[in-house]
């Protein structure tokens, strides 16, 4: 992964994802997912981001705060507030998800993509575990 998920996942970390997770359960807000980047027509580019918006929800970003359906989202994994930007509004279509990196000021994520939403069939795994570096082995799905 790139630096977009720091400090949760650092550049150079290695993770294990489960392809089976989403065979039995729908993706949930807060999951860290591996998915096909929606702006890559070849479908070969994989991204790792956190699921923020679920199907049918609205996502607003105002004064560095993320709101889901008008309610502020509690994000204890964020290391620093987002740099101020113009307010943003997104309406997540059914069958799609809105993804953001934890390192918001250095993340190329759904806020800036041409195709803002990731279709459920583009999500290939839920990140469960960091196995490298060995000194930082840990579960990431808690």
Residue ranges and their predicted role:
Residues 1-5:
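Aromatic-capped interface at the extracytoplasmic side
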Residues 6-142:
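Soluble "head" domains of membrane/secretory-pathway proteins
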